[in-house]
Amino acid sequence: MSSPNSDDSHLWVNWDEYHRLIERLSLQVFESGWQFDQILCLARGGVRVGDVMSRIFDVPLGILATSSYREAAGTKQGDLDIAQFITITRGSLQGRVLLVDDMVDTGKTFMKVHDHLKNQFPAITELRSAVLWWKGHSQATPDYYVDKLPMNPWIHQPFEDYDSLRPHQLEAWIRKGSR
């Protein structure tokens, strides 16, 4: 099933495109020569990005849950909630950390998380950020990004199909071959 055409208001991304973006981001970080100790991804949007990158770089993955897009069916940014704890596979958050998310939109989340990490985790010696998309109106600048979007399109990521899918709908979904 093909995606609708993208325009200034909507950017449609399929699974293959999504994974190529993660690979391009990983290559960009690698080619920068920066050596980091851990990846910290922001859940939920950065989880897939962080998972793939932690496998490529063979470094521990930490997950920090954040949430601000709850209103208007997840399309309007509200107050930011940052989880009290970080889940990490080995050790604690320290040293050189690569903060990963799917995008920097307004930049508010990135700036608040950056401040939170610096205040709560003094063992972090260097913090850099990597995203797939950097929106032009953002107040924050990521260290690494794949696409800078001068406009402010809604990015339709491939996993958004699951946002409206419920367990009782799975059988029909599978039979239909919806993807």
Stretch-by-stretch model annotation:
Residues 1-179:
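PRPP-associated nucleotide enzymes
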